[in-house]
Amino acid sequence: MRFVMPGDRIGSAEEYVKGEGVYEEGGELFAAVAGKLIIKDRVAKVESISPIPEIVKGDVVLGRVVDLRNSIALIEVSSKKGENRGPSNRGIGILHVSNVDEGYVKEISEAVGYLDILKARVIGDNLRLSTKEEEMGVLRALCSNCKTEMVREGDILKCPECGRVEKRKISTDYGKGEW
C-alpha cells in the first residue's frame, strides 16, 4: 500500500480496473482523493483518509435557490450540517410547495426567492427537501428589486436600501451567520 494524492497516476486502464476513489482519463487511472492505494484482484481503489460525507434522509443541509417554478424550488445543495467538507452527493434538491410550511402556501415564491440561502431537512431520495420545522427556512435573502441583503422585521423581510417588504419562510437562525 502507498499513500496517494488527488491526481497521482496509479497505472493504466489495461493494468487495473477502476475502483472507488479512482478516475480514468485517456486510458490512465488517477487518484480522485487523498488516501491509501489498495490494489486487490486487479481493482485499484483509494481509501480516503477522511471519508467524504453522504447526504441521507434526515440530514440538515444548506443550499441556494437556483430556480423557481409554480410549485417547486430547485436548491443547489452545498453543505451537510456537522461536516467540514462538502458531501459527495451534493447536487440539486427539490423543495415542493407542500413541504414548505405547516400552513397552506399557494405558490413557492411566497416562501423562498431566487438566490436565497436556506436550511432544509432531507425527507426522501433524490434530495427531496422540507422547511416545515421552525428552524428550517431562509437564512439569507436578497431584495428582489435592488439585490441588497434583507433585514428581518418580525415575520417579514425589509430591504434597508429601497424599503421593499417581502415575505419568506424565515428560519429562526435568519441573519445570525450560523446554521
UniProtKB/Swiss-Prot annotation:
Q: What is its main location?
A: cytoplasm
One annotated GO molecular function is: zinc ion binding
Pfam families (UniProt xref): ECR1_N, EXOSC1
Binding positions for Zn(2+) per the UniProt entry: 143, 146, 159, 162
> Locate the S1 motif domain: which residues?
58-137
Localization terms from the record: Cytoplasm
Question: What GO terms describe the biological role, i.e. biological process, of this protein?
Answer: RNA catabolic process; RNA processing
User: Know anything about its domains from the record?
Assistant: Contains an N-terminal domain that mediates interactions with the hexameric ring, a central S1 domain and a C-terminal zinc-ribbon domain.
The record makes one more remark, namely:
The zinc ion has probably a structural role.
Q: What does the UniProt record say this protein does?
A: Non-catalytic component of the exosome, which is a complex involved in RNA degradation. Increases the RNA binding and the efficiency of RNA degradation. Helpful for the interaction of the exosome with A-poor RNAs.
The annotated subunit structure for this chain is: Component of the archaeal exosome complex. Forms a trimer of Rrp4 and/or Csl4 subunits. The trimer associates with a hexameric ring-like arrangement composed of 3 Rrp41-Rrp42 heterodimers. Interacts with DnaG.
What is the protein's given name? Exosome complex component Csl4
Origin organism of this chain? Archaeoglobus fulgidus (strain ATCC 49558 / DSM 4304 / JCM 9628 / NBRC 100126 / VC-16)
Q: What gene makes this protein?
A: csl4
